[in-house]
Each structure stands twice: as C-alpha cells, then as structure tokens.
UniProtKB/Swiss-Prot annotation:
Entry keyword annotation includes Zinc: no
Enzyme class: lyase
Enzyme Commission code: 4.1.1.97
Protein name, UniProt field: Putative 2-oxo-4-hydroxy-4-carboxy-5-ureidoimidazoline decarboxylase
Function: Catalyzes the stereoselective decarboxylation of 2-oxo-4-hydroxy-4-carboxy-5-ureidoimidazoline (OHCU) to (S)-allantoin.
Length: 173
C-alpha cells in the first residue's frame, strides 16, 4: 500500500488498518489520523511515536498494559491478536516445553509485580532462549529506566507493524 492510499483513508478505515500498530491501542491510530497527510512511512511512525511520548506516565503505562505476557496464557489459548500470534510464534514461544513455560510464567509474574505492567519485547528480534534472559536482566533495572526501555520496545514493534502494513497488498487488509 502506498502513502497516498494511507492519506486517502477515512477515519474508520485508518483505524481498522492501523489500530493494532500499537498493541490493542486503536485510540492512537484515531488520534494520528488527524495528522494526515503523511509524507512516508517514517513520517507516519513519527506521529505514532510522538503521541506515545506526549502521554503522561499513566498513559504510557496503560499502553504497556495492553500487551500480553510473552508465552503467556493468551498464547496458549490462542486469543492473542494476529500480530502478536505471528511475532511470538516466530520467536519460538509457541513451542516452549513445560519447564520453559513455567520459568517464563514465573518471570512474567515477578516483572508485573515489580513494574505494574507486562514485560514487552519486540519478539521478532528475539528467540525462545533470549526472552527469559532479557526478562531476568530487565527485572533488575530501575523503574524509570525500565519504563523507557519498554516504550522503546513498543516503538520497535510498532515500526515493524507499520512497515508490514505499508508493504501489504491493500486488497488483503
């Protein structure tokens, strides 16, 4: 899909297409729509990320809370968004053994208890062995640093998803 197509979308179509660029946060797409026209993918990204950056900390934490646990119960039940399903499966998280799933569940619970939001990682840049290592490492980070890191991961995920959408055949959206 080209940027002209993006710029010609009405609000409903734009939210339908871009509403999950940030996991389960169609409000961001609805807000970004009013910033049209976009010159290119980077400009579109800039507006998505500026919206996130402009939020108060509680809003940023809310965005993080919209993300599922990696290899969590939603993956096991098959209730992830299509994007998260592909990303987590691609990182090998669907094929974890019972011990690996248990270890990740324990780390996810510790992380949530410590920071108040789920561990967010751009799974496309990771794999089943790196995820628990990174989760354990980030558990030791100061809260303010971890908020910045987690939001950086949200932006990596968003960047990949936006690029996927702009490369996609509009007839398949």
């Amino acid at each position: 899909m080209d940027i002209e197509k993006v710029n010609s979308m009405d609000l409903g179509e734009f939210v339908d297409v871009f509403g999950n660029a940030t996991e389960r946060c169609p409000l961001i797409a609805a807000a970004v729509w009013s910033q049209r026209p976009f010159s290119d993918l980077e400009d579109l990204e800039k507006h998505f990320f500026a919206f996130i950056d402009a939020l108060a900390q509680s809003g940023q934490e809310g965005i993080l809370r919209c993300h599922p646990d990696l290899a969590g119960s939603e993956l096991q039940r098959g209730t992830l968004t299509a994007e998260s399903q592909r990303e987590q499966s691609g990182a090998g998280l669907r094929s974890l053994g019972a011990d690996e799933r248990l270890r990740l569940a324990e780390l996810n619970a510790q992380y949530r208890a410590r920071f108040g939001f789920p561990f967010v990682l751009a799974a496309r840049f990771s794999d089943r062995t790196a995820v628990p290592r990174e989760l354990a490492r980030r558990l030791l980070c100061p809260s303010a640093q971890e908020l910045r890191t987690a939001l950086g991961e949200v932006k990596k995920i968003g960047s990949l998803r936006l690029a996927d959408l702009l490369r996609a055949d509009p007839a398949k959206l």
